C-alpha cells in the first residue's frame, strides 16, 4: 500500500477526484488520469517530507 495516499484528508481526496474528473473531461483515460494525479500526490508528499527533514 502507498502510505502517502492513505494519509490524505477527505478534502484532499475530494480535490484529487475533481482533478481526475477534469482530466477525463479533457479526453484522458480514467486509468491515465488516476496515474497522473497519484504521481502528483506522491511528488507533493515527497517534497513535504524532505522539507520537514531539512
UniProtKB/Swiss-Prot annotation:
Protein source organism: Actinobacillus pleuropneumoniae serotype 5b (strain L20)
Tell me which stretches of the chain form a coiled coil. Answer: none
Enumerate the HAMAP family for this protein. Answer: UPF0181 (MF_00507)
In terms of superkingdom, the source organism counts as Bacteria
By sequence similarity, the record places it as follows: Belongs to the UPF0181 family.
Q: Which Pfam families match?
A: UPF0181 (PF03701)
Output this protein's name: UPF0181 protein APL_0863
Amino acid at each position: 500500500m502507498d502510505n502517502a495516499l492513505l494519509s490524505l484528508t477527505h478534502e484532499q481526496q475530494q480535490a484529487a477526484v475533481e482533478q481526475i474528473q477534469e482530466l477525463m473531461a479533457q479526453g484522458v483515460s480514467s486509468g491515465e488520469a488516476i496515474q497522473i494525479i497519484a504521481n502528483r500526490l506522491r511528488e507533493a508528499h515527497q517534497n513535504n517530507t524532505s522539507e520537514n527533514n531539512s
